[in-house]
Amino acid sequence: MQLRGTTIVAVRTEAGVAVAGDGQVTLGQAIAVKHTARKVRRMYKDKVVIGFAGATADAFTLFERFEAKLEEFGGNLVRASVELAKDWRKDKYLRRLEAMMIVADAGNVLILSGTGDVIEPDDGVAAIGSGGPYAMAAARALLRNTELSAREIVEKSMAIAAEMCVYTNDQLVVETLEKPA
């Protein structure tokens, strides 16, 4: 699946989680039609952050289904993700959706892939979309070699991705969740 026009990155630290996404929407392969789209959003009583990449209508379909699963399972991020993935694999309509999501709460970061997989990165760093490899490399380097906050890491990682990827811009939406004391 070729995901163009978006980069989403998430970083988990001891203090919490930050998720960032750029605002560019690209039509086809060359025309940027919007620069301030919100691809990172809060849900479930502001305790979960989701970022999505891929076809917009498909992403919103998954967003709505994921929100329903969170409600059904009392905000349990992992359970809601696994149950959505099961539906994603079983449902012929859902299997054709071209979207990916990063979902996070204060202690977890998960990637929900376009094939219905649930992936928890070992180091708490995840990235999807066209600039994902650049953002992930930058985030890992910053996490390992600096004392920056999760928010600062995702902001700097997205800036680097925007320099490298023509389908990513510097109009960021960043959401953070702190671990309870």
Swiss-Prot record:
Keywords: Allosteric enzyme, Cytoplasm, Hydrolase, Metal-binding, Protease, Sodium, Threonine protease. The keyword Transcription regulation does not apply. The active site is at T6. The keyword Hydrolase applies. GO terms for biological process: proteolysis involved in protein catabolic process. PROSITE patterns: PROTEASOME_BETA_2. NCBIfam families: ATP_dep_HslV, PRK05456.1. One of its GO terms (cellular component) is proteasome core complex. Its main location: cytoplasm. A double ring-shaped homohexamer of HslV is capped on each side by a ring-shaped HslU homohexamer. The assembly of the HslU/HslV complex is dependent on binding of ATP. This is ATP-dependent protease subunit HslV. HAMAP family: HslV. Allosterically activated by HslU binding. GO terms for molecular function: metal ion binding; threonine-type endopeptidase activity. It is found in: Cytoplasm. SUPFAM superfamilies: N-terminal nucleophile aminohydrolases (Ntn hydrolases). It catalyses: ATP-dependent cleavage of peptide bonds with broad specificity. Belongs to the peptidase T1B family. HslV subfamily. It is an enzyme of class 3 (hydrolase). Its EC number is 3.4.25.2. Na(+) binds at A162, C165, T168. It holds the Pfam family Proteasome. It comes from Solidesulfovibrio magneticus (strain ATCC 700980 / DSM 13731 / RS-1) (Desulfovibrio magneticus). Protease subunit of a proteasome-like degradation complex believed to be a general protein degrading machinery.
